Amino acid sequence: MSLNLEQARSALDTPFVLDLNTPLDLWLREVNTVTGPGQAFSMIFRTAPEPVLPQQTYRLRHETLGEQWLFLVPLTVDSESAVYEALFNN
């Protein structure tokens, strides 16, 4: 299922869980509209700095949105957190 802007905004400040050896919570901190055709937007996630996730598609679970496959791009990583972005063009 592809997310729309309204669904993404409803999930602000809630975790998406990535199942690794130890589950990793990615907290949705921003939903921003972007220039593009249709209803383009980005989702910005913040999580622990380790493990560093390479750019690729991940299966994430959300309490109300269910399972989502998102292509995550690392934006920044420092000693306190890592920030990732997913872009949508609906």
Task: List PLM regions with ranges.
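Surface-exposed, beta-sheet-biased, low-hydrophobicity segments with strongly acidic/polar composition
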Residues: 1-90
